[in-house]
Amino acid sequence: MHPLIQEAIRITQDLGGVVFIGAVGILLQTKVTRESQDLDFAVAKELPAELLDEKQYFTRKIKGKEVRYTPRGYKIDIYTKDVSGIPIDKVIATAKDIEVKREVTVKAASVEVLVVSKFRAAAKRKGADDTDIRTLAQRKYKGIDWDLLKTLTMSEIEFLRIRNQMDALHRMQLRF
């Protein structure tokens, strides 16, 4: 089992109610891995520092910023308000339980949340987000609920841009 999935299981056991986004969300939804050094997840409400400390989730100052780690040394980013502008309540309400081994599930953001959040992130920076978008188009295109995805976008223009680019990526894949 992939080490990030093992860590996702441990985080879920430690903290409960977490929804994985980012590289781990993509891995859970598509079974495609890419290099990632951290685990990003959403929770319905702020996790008190005391709880995290009690569970031995520790912080380090890196370049003047507090960075949180699991007891096993994995860097984590915890989202409590939104994921790339998508409200946390929608991220959690649309999350999917993914079975990672017999009778063990971990929650991942829905494909629709991952698509919208990756498109928004890719607009701000170059890199892994483009790869993640291609992976989602290749592996999950046919299962996308376009009506749900539309409710996650901020405008008709954003929805059409995402839809058109996903359509094009899917068609390109069919040619190879």
Where are these regions (language model features)?
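Compositionally biased terminal segments of proteins
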Residues: 1-176
